[in-house]
Design a protein with these regions (language model features):
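Immediate post-signal peptide segment of exported/extracytoplasmic ligand-binding proteins
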Residues: 34-63, 82-83, 186-190
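Extracytoplasmic ligand-binding site segments that recognize negatively charged/polar headgroups
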Residues: 63-78, 90-108, 112-250
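Periplasmic-binding protein-like
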Residues: 146-147, 160-163, 191-199, 223-229, 233-236, 306-329, ...
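Extracellular/periplasmic bilobal clamshell ligand-binding domains
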Residues: 329-369
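A ligand-binding cleft/hinge motif common to bilobed small-molecule-binding domains
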Residues: 124-127, 252-271
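A bilobed periplasmic-binding-protein/Venus flytrap-type ligand-binding module shared by bacterial periplasmic
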Residues: 164-171, 207-212, 283-298, 314-315
Length: 369
């Protein structure tokens, strides 16, 4: 029997199509035809968590670069995440925010991305500035105050920081504690106050906070008076080190420090306390997802977990301030939370921090150097 060439070609084409469809079905079932990372990060469907879990099982790991204290916060986060998602290995690397973003950016430029997620004070906006962040959606931030959230989804807040003064209780009498920025101009504090230089959340944030809250004219008039107080420019260590110097009596008052640090030391018997002033400068540590990440499903599970009530509770117990309004801070630290202290708050978001830091540094150099 002689088979016509056209019939043969038709059967061959049908066989090819069926084989292709069968392979496609197998590949889809195996996850090889999964959504793009961008689609995964922005997925909002009702089956979102299940899709993330299925994808994370295939990925098997996730990497975060974070500024969280390792034993105090990151390890409990890793333990809790591991119990909830035992099929995902979490790898962490700790450094300060600037180093974290620099390392992640270098990886992106080299097309050798290791980090899936970066976290730290200002890290989100720095990642945006470095063009290494990409948008993501997480339902965990729905209950967060709108002021703390990024409308583009390029970062999400993980924890808050409140700034105030630390003062030595042996050197500053209770009735002499400065309770306003104007009271810092009292001549008795001339040469007895210090602030931290070399950090965006040190001297520049002090100046930025008042520039935003008061306006440039009023703030500059105040700075012109403040310069006569001969504030000591402290550059020999971290904000925590500066508080320790206050405890030691080297300085009577430290300006614009993390207000919970002196409270932690006070609880241990140190002669130090904190005072917040109107307006209280507030910043947020933020979390971004890195362009070119290899584990998008697991990265979203990790982001969801850190921002969940469980994750926020872990951070609260680690002496951080949660962003979730339903998660309370530790009672010993609560007095410096603006809404509890009854003092107005000025949230200096990552975008504002970056926008104002250079010009505030210029003011510092001209007036206080």
């Amino acid at each position: 029997m002689i088979e016509r060439a056209g019939s043969h070609r038709l059967r061959a084409l049908r066989s090819t199509v069926l084989s292709t469809l069968a392979c496609a079905a197998l590949l889809w079932a195996d996850g090889a035809l999964a959504q793009s990372p961008e689609d995964i990060l922005m997925y909002r469907g009702p089956d979102r968590e299940q899709k993330l879990i299925e994808g994370a099982k295939r990925e098997g790991q996730v990497v975060i670069y974070a500024a969280l204290i390792q034993n105090q916060a990151m390890r409990p986060i890793a333990d809790g995440f591991g119990k909830k998602y035992p099929f995902v290995k979490l790898t962490t690397w700790r450094a300060d925010s600037e180093d974290i973003v620099q390392k992640a950016a270098a990886e992106v430029r080299a097309h050798n991305v290791v980090a899936d997620v970066v976290e730290g004070t200002g890290a989100g906006e720095e990642a945006v500035e470095a063009n290494i962040a990409q948008p993501y959606y997480t339902p965990a931030v729905a209950g967060f105050a709108p002021a703390y959230r990024n409308p583009t989804g390029l970062w999400a807040p993980t924890r808050l920081s409140y700034y105030g003064t630390a003062y030595n209780t042996k050197l500053v009498a209770p009735d002499k504690v400065p309770k306003s920025y104007e009271e810092l101009l009292d001549p008795q504090w001339k040469g007895r106050m210090a602030w931290r230089i070399g950090s965006a959340t040190g001297t520049p944030l002090f100046l930025t906070n008042l520039r935003i809250a008061w306006g440039e004219e009023k703030a500059r008039a105040y700075f012109d008076k403040l310069k006569d107080q001969k504030i000591v420019n402290f550059g020999a260590g971290s904000a925590r080190t500066l508080v320790d110097r206050v405890i030691a009596g080297e300085y009577a008052i430290a300006l614009n420090i993390f207000a919970h640090h002196p409270l932690i030391s006070k609880a241990k018997g140190a002669p130090v306390n904190a005072q917040v002033m109107d307006p209280v400068a507030t910043t947020a540590a933020t979390m971004s997802v890195v362009k070119g990440l290899h584990h998008p499903h697991a990265a979203m599970l990790l982001a969801d977990y850190i921002l969940s009530k469980e994750g926020q509770g872990i951070l609260a117990r680690a002496e951080y301030f949660p962003v979730d309004p339903d998660v309370a801070p530790l009672p010993a630290l609560a007095p410096i939370v603006p809404k509890i202290a009854g003092v107005p708050e000025n949230f200096v978001g990552p975008d504002k921090l970056i926008k104002y830091t250079d010009s505030s540094e210029d003011i510092y150099q001209k007036l206080f150097r």
